[in-house]
Amino acid sequence: MAGQVVQYGRHRKRRNYARISEVLELPNLIEIQTKSYEWFLREGLIEMFRDISPIEDFTGNLSLEFVDYRLGEPKYDLEESKNRDATYAAPLRVKVRLIIKETGEVKEQEVFMGDFPLMTDTGTFVINGAERVIVSQLVRSPSVYFNEKIDKNGRENYDATIIPNRGAWLEYETDAKDVVYVRIDRTRKLPLTVLLRALGFSSDQEIVDLLGDNEYLRNTLEKDGTENTEQALLEIYERLRPGEPPTVENAKSLLYSRFFDPKRYDLASVGRYKTNKKLHLKHRLFNQKLAEPIVNTETGEIVVEEGTVLDRRKIDEIMDVLESNANSEVFELHGSVIDEPVEIQSIKVYVPNDDEGRTTTVIGNAFPDSEVKCITPADIIASMSYFFNLLSGIGYTDDIDHLGNRRLRSVGELLQNQFRIGLSRMERVVRERMSIQDTESITPQQLINIRPVIASIKEFFGSSQLSQFMDQANPLAELTHKRRLSALGPGGLTRERAQMEVRDVHYSHYGRMCPIETPEGPNIGLINSLSSYARVNEFGFIETPYRKVDLDTHAITDQIDYLTADEEDSYVVAQANSKLDENGRFMDDEVVCRFRGNNTVMAKEKMDYMDVSPKQVVSAATACIPFLENDDSNRALMGANMQRQAVPLMNPEAPFVGTGMEHVAARDSGAAITAKHRGRVEHVESNEILVRRLVEENGVEHEGELDRYPLAKFKRSNSGTCYNQRPIVAVGDVVEFNEILADGPSMELGEMALGRNVVVGFMTWDGYNYEDAVIMSERLVKDDVYTSIHIEEYESEARDTKLGPEEITRDIPNVSESALKNLDDRGIVYIGAEVKDGDILVGKVTPKGVTELTAEERLLHAIFGEKAREVRDTSLRVPHGAGGIVLDVKVFNREEGDDTLSPGVNQLVRVYIVQKRKIHVGDKMCGRHGNKGVISKIVPEEDMPYLPDGRPIDIMLNPLGVPSRMNIGQVLELHLGMAAKNLGIHVASPVFDGANDDDVWSTIEEAGMARDGKTVLYDGRTGEPFDNRISVGVMYMLKLAHMVDDKLHARSTGPYSLVTQQPLGGKAQFGGQRFGEMEVWALEAYGAAYTLQEILTYKSDDTVGRVKTYEAIVKGENISRPSVPESFRVLMKELQSLGLDVKVMDEQDNEIEMTDVDDDDVVERKVDLQQNDAPETQKEVTD
């Protein structure tokens, strides 16, 4: 027997075919969300308050400092927040200190700074009652970038850009005449030497001494019209502020504020880290030949002689000397923007491949401290030096798509940036109030206005592109949404501008971003998924784990290092499936490995690291596809994406053929309930589990406190499916930390169960499975195999109107008693009532405008003291095509103190309707390999082809769907699934390390099946065997969210667009089917004149004709001739508005009057207020 049995959770054993043992457990899959938010609460908030403190007034007398903060208890717990449409948030209280410097008085106060949304344990936020996810954003890291470009004459040119986190960009570029220019903040370009002079290197000789002599520098100096620092400062000021009178002082303060003021310019810690990495000498001298010795500044000894070529070993040896600033120089700059001395490191090297032995100077930025978040003059000089070095052939250009140059902004940082915007707006208000208020009686509370802070947080959670309504179709969809990486959003790319290169798979994605899972369509490659083992480091770069190879013994050690993409570029990495002996040494002399972008074969002595697992390349969703290695990547992409659209079934079933990922994905998704502590189960009910903690002290175990775990029962998920949790533990079980206590939707015994295992035959059947269609047995309908439960929510509000309040009541004008049969005395539908479309759910009346009373009404009013009520019926009805059983009704009243109701609403009623949807013709099904199709026919069980033992098969798929799609994984799954079913086992075939051909065939033999996996099938209609043997097996098939019930739509009359008077489009607007230009051509080609006429008039925008037609149909009369379509009038009006005199003439050249439609012609037109989601105001024609 191939494979070994592995336990997944408490209840499931699987035969696992993996050959490579797991050396590292998968991390918690949603830690990218939870860790980032924890960092924000622990450090991010304090960091921001520190940045903004102190706020001083214009005189410097008052100073406001933010000392400390604390989060209080949330007003509503999680469940209550969802029920009340509230935000799950805690009050943020900040300790603020006001110092009055004149008197030395200090006032301290705790100030309320608004409610701050809290993250749930499962990595989501509840905002206005809805669960939302903050997606991490992939952005360009702040740093110095060098880029190579070819000009129109075919010459190599370079440009460089210093990109900060916030602040002005600095760019260098060359032109056709070999002059180097600089651009400050995207303005017009200046010769580079102008900026150097402005920094204090005033004479030509100083500049040449600094950067070393070369022709580019000489050309630039010739072009430069300035001669000293003052002239350079004035020149820069004129470029940046044209039209303003330049003075030296103004120019200095402008340059200072652009680059050296920490409030205006911020590299952030990641920018400082990347800049130091790029510009420090230790990274730039690699493989260079020295033209001067390197001297230890402290001892004066020569560490490396002139003429030495510095390889990696040599650089490692002298690293300490380089870091302690060997060969450093300090320049005292006078009259420049910054008065402090500038320290740089400079070493002369020989220009590579130069026969004349010329030298060039490599200048480093002398490694400024990581606390320095601004750019320094040393950075600017070093970046210029790098640019000149590139022109001499020293150094590398950057690949912007490399993950070493792209970083993640996770929840914490996105929130911090948003909070910072709010705080800076608040800072302005505080300054203004300081100058107005009386210093004697002033308190911190009076100075601070928290509105801008609250507004910016609300805006971020409510309407940012990165704050998304959680995809809750199934646990995998939840999990993937939390691990999603988007390159879109504020400060990111836009769909239209993103090039092919950005979207493409890059070698640095290996183990960091999934190369397979990305949406099809305009977002392809811009939205990605985090790989299974990847994590995010403190700078926001994605790291992936590798096993370290001992450099002396060349054996694999137990040490696991997490490497970022640019760190990995220095190492040779062996594949996870390299053969090792029992001591961890490579068995082959030549090993398949990766170095930078190349897959090569190298000697085993050259290996530095080895992959931890074959599945570290792919994301959690992709890792759920068995036999992924046998599928084409495009189909695998569809398979990964479609698993997220699977509808939770009534009776879910875990796959016979899994990958071992099902348990982990289900546990971490947040849909299951997991134990927060080790303990013993004391009580189990369908809606609650009680666990007594077991605590170990001094080796003795004793009982601790009791944990309660409430279960969600038949709740509505974000995508309208049923969210229900079922216990899978029994009283007395001892559960470990993080063990699954209760299954969520689409789960079975602690494993993800998105679909069902069904018996599938690859065969055609009367052409019903043409074009990927699926033929299904009626058994799957009868036995509720693919039945799902759907819950829809409808709400009705009673508001205050100008004419009086709306009322929820049973007393509705002009409605028969039979229409009210499901309503209780309040006018609200009973729980358990069965309703169909058009039925009243909540009776509601709205006051009409008061009209002049008739004499009779005045008499009635005088007698009964009440006039006949002028109200119209605005009841909530079941929309077209919906219906089901009323599951729950929630009523919120303002009188009962429901402060969560929005202003103007007195009462809110929510009705939940549940539907049980069996599978239909027209529903979409798929497997896990991108093999999707629509059900074309449901065949009676007795007519389905049957196996030799008489069992009918469940589904027939077209064999032509396999060869051209190249997803052979489905065939292997089919055979292995059948073997597993016959053996009564579950199997796991992990990606890239699963069952191979031999394993599959040996398991088939073990199950007693035919060697080729095929069987004779008999036609259920005739009892005859089919001509050839057929591949029959068990495949895991899912029912997708694209259900025909949601798409079926029909209309006779309905709302019309206001201007063109044509029917609206789309099911949501109850619209019609568009008959477009090409369809008109088709009818013209057939000469179907009358059909064409009625389609373009009565059925579209002939307002008079359609009313008369409706009347004629009702009365059984002949239909009258059509009149002029409204769109023709619109066209005439448009031409007339252009100043053209347009008239319509008949055959006798008499003008036809184009009068507007008279209201008498139309029976009744009313603006349809219920259709509030339609794009324009509609008019509806009623009989």
Swiss-Prot record:
Q: Which PROSITE patterns match?
A: RNA_POL_BETA
The record's subunit annotation is: The RNAP catalytic core consists of 2 alpha, 1 beta, 1 beta' and 1 omega subunit. When a sigma factor is associated with the core the holoenzyme is formed, which can initiate transcription.
Q: What GO biological process terms are annotated to this protein in UniProt?
A: DNA-templated transcription
Q: Which InterPro entries match?
A: DNA-dir_RNA_pol_bsu_ext_1_sf (IPR042107), DNA-dir_RNA_pol_bsu_external_1 (IPR019462), DNA-dir_RNA_pol_su2 (IPR015712), DNA-dir_RNAP_su2_dom (IPR007120), DNA-dir_RNAP_su2_hyb_sf (IPR037033), RNA_pol_bsu_bac (IPR010243), RNA_pol_bsu_CS (IPR007121), RNA_pol_bsu_protrusion (IPR007644)
According to the UniProt record, one GO cellular component term is: DNA-directed RNA polymerase complex
CDD domains recorded: RNA_pol_B_RPB2
Gene Ontology molecular function: DNA binding; DNA-directed RNA polymerase activity; ribonucleoside binding
Cystine crosslinks: none
Entry's PANTHER family?
DNA-DIRECTED RNA POLYMERASE I SUBUNIT 2
Q: What is its EC number?
A: 2.7.7.6
What protein is this chain from? DNA-directed RNA polymerase subunit beta
Reaction catalysed? RNA(n) + a ribonucleoside 5'-triphosphate = RNA(n+1) + diphosphate
Q: Which species is listed as the source?
A: Staphylococcus aureus (strain MRSA252)
Biological role: DNA-dependent RNA polymerase catalyzes the transcription of DNA into RNA using the four ribonucleoside triphosphates as substrates.
Query: In which family does this protein belong, per the annotation?
Result: Belongs to the RNA polymerase beta chain family.
Which keywords belong to this entry? DNA-directed RNA polymerase, Nucleotidyltransferase, Transcription, Transferase
Q: Which NCBIfam families match?
A: PRK00405.1, rpoB
